[in-house]
Amino acid sequence: MPDTTNTKSDLEILTQLNADFLASVQNGDVRRFEQILAEDFMASLPDFLLRDKKQFLDMMAAPRRFAEIKADDVRIRLLGDFAIIHAHMTFRTADGVRRQGRYTDDWQRRDGKWLCVAANPFWEQP
């Protein structure tokens, strides 16, 4: 029988980390991102660029382009020390337009701590 001792705890931790990630995007919280992103983090963004952790943090430090970010249909898939979070999101752009999209974030447990190793958001374009 598989050991499920940490499953609930891991799900709770990853649920909170997902909420922290979204709040950090909305608020430009670079400090929190420094805590939850792996050193080898990569982000594939809708502008077709692949950004490393430093480039992503620089982008997050810029003035916000999004507000009212909300996630629903959040699905967390635990695969041992690796987890994939799929979700639908809605947000408002700086000019007030409501948009929707999806994201897939990959998390890995390293030295007992969950870290985001990849982020892949996409949303409808005007």
Describe the residue ranges of each PLM region.
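A beta-strand edge to alpha-helix "cap/lid" segment located at domain peripheries
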Residues: 2-35, 40-126
